[in-house]
Amino acid sequence: MTTKNRTALVLAAVTMVVAVRAQQPAAGDAKLADAAVRGWFPKLAARTPLASRPEVEAVRNPKGEALGWIFRSDQIEPVVRGKRGEIGVWVALGADGMIRGVKVGVHREDKKWFDRIRAPFYKAFENRPADGSRGRPDAVTTATVSSRAMTDDVFGACRAVMGLPEVSERLAAAANGQSGKPAPTRK
């Protein structure tokens, strides 16, 4: 084998490894850092997984009251696919039933198009009812499939989480002006 052929073979192998690696989810995205969560819930003192759905975390203040929940949309059914696959969006759902914010986690969308989805689109989720009753953010031109998938995924995941017993009880209590303290445990 000549040096030229060997170089071409190595280059092809490296290209394949890079292409396969680009399709893999980003490492370290399994849990959102407390600093990011504090951006949505400044009084964060603890994060506790829900008993019924450990992938959904209750965000609690120093008194143990639930401020809301955080979860990644691609871990909650129904999962909506973008152009190239699932888009994992971190969602902060407040105890008042409003979306506090979203942050893109893992995705396999084309970087060229996905980068067109900017801060104004993400900000458009903030302070919207998680049930979608006050409309949804508009899709982004030139990234229509990805932005629509994100919107459908966020609101679909919110509806699923709001249907969980621990969450629906807290939302009902908040609607009635009651405290979000966890119920005392029986011995």
Label every model-predicted segment.
Residues A22-V140, T144-K187:
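Flexible, solvent-exposed loop/hinge segments and secondary-structure transition points
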